[in-house]
A protein has these predicted regions:
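Bacterial Sec-dependent N-terminal signal peptides
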Residues: 1-23
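Mature catalytic domains of secreted/periplasmic carbohydrate-active enzymes
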Residues: 21-231
Length: 231
C-alpha cells in the first residue's frame, strides 16, 4: 500500500512539474528566436505565443468602425495637400449621435475618428494651427467634431479612439524634426487630455514631404510615452 501511495505521489509530482514546465514555455507579447534556431523550432515557438491581457481584450471587441471624415469629405480627394481652404468644411447636418447609434445597432464596439489626416486639418479647435474647424464656417468656428463624437460614444456606451496622422502637409515646421515632434506631441496631448478616456490611438507610417519639401524623423518613443503618461 505504501509503495502504491508513493508511486501515485511521484506520478502526480511529475505531472505537476511537466505542466509547470509546459506553462513556462508559453511566450507573452513577443518571442525572440535564438540565432541557432531551426525553422521547426521557430514554428514551434511562434505557435506558443499568446496575447497580453490588453491584446486579448482588444480582440474580444471584434468590430471597430474607422470613420474617415474630414476636409477631404468636401474636396473628394483621398489625400489632401494641406492647402485646403478651411471654409470648405461646412457640414449642414452632421449628427454624431446618428453615426454612433447606427454603428451600435450594427454590432460595433468602438468608433475611431480621423482627428487629423495627412492634410493637417484638425477636427477639433486645436491651439497648434489655424488649419482646423475653428477657422471654418461650421457652427461659426465654434464646432468640435471630436467632442461631439466623444459625447455620442458616452451616450451609447461605445469605446472611443482617435487617428492622428504624423505626416502633416500643412505644418510649416514639418521636416524640422525637434520642432515638429513637439508640435505633434502638443496635438496628441490635447486629444488625450480634453476628451476623457481614449481607448485607442492610431498612427501610420506615412512620411512624405511637408510644405517645405523636407521629410520628418518621427520620435515614436516620445509619442508612445505621451500616450502612456496621459492615458
Amino acid at each position: 500500500m505504501n509503495k502504491l501511495l508513493t508511486s501515485l505521489l511521484l506520478s502526480v509530482t511529475l505531472m505537476s512539474g511537466a505542466q509547470a514546465q509546459k506553462k513556462e514555455n508559453y511566450y507573452v507579447k513577443h518571442v525572440e528566436f535564438p540565432q541557432s534556431a531551426t525553422i521547426e523550432q521557430k514554428v514551434d515557438m511562434a505557435a506558443r505565443l499568446v496575447p497580453t491581457p490588453q491584446q486579448y481584450a482588444w480582440q474580444q471587441m471584434e468590430l471597430t468602425a474607422f470613420l474617415h471624415f474630414g476636409i477631404n469629405t468636401f474636396t473628394g480627394r483621398e489625400w489632401g495637400d494641406g492647402k485646403e481652404d478651411p471654409a470648405l468644411f461646412n457640414p449642414s447636418e452632421l449628427d454624431a449621435e446618428q453615426w454612433v447609434r447606427t454603428l451600435k445597432e450594427a454590432g460595433f464596439k468602438m468608433v475611431l475618428l480621423t482627428a487629423k489626416h495627412h492634410d493637417g486639418f484638425c477636427l477639433w479647435p486645436t491651439a497648434t494651427t489655424k488649419h482646423s474647424v475653428a477657422s471654418s464656417p461650421w457652427k461659426n468656428g465654434q464646432g468640435d467634431v471630436v467632442k461631439e463624437l466623444r459625447a455620442a460614444c458616452d451616450k451609447y456606451d461605445m469605446k472611443f479612439g482617435v487617428y492622428l496622422s504624423p505626416w502633416d502637409r500643412n505644418a510649416e515646421c514639418y521636416g524640422d524634426s525637434p520642432r515638429y515632434n513637439d508640435f505633434f506631441i502638443r496635438q496628441l496631448t490635447e486629444l488625450l487630455t480634453n476628451y476623457g478616456e481614449v481607448h485607442e490611438v492610431w498612427f501610420d507610417g506615412a512620411n512624405g514631404e511637408g510644405p517645405n519639401g523636407k521629410k520628418q524623423v518621427y520620435d515614436w518613443d516620445a509619442f508612445y510615452q505621451t500616450i502612456q503618461r496621459l492615458q
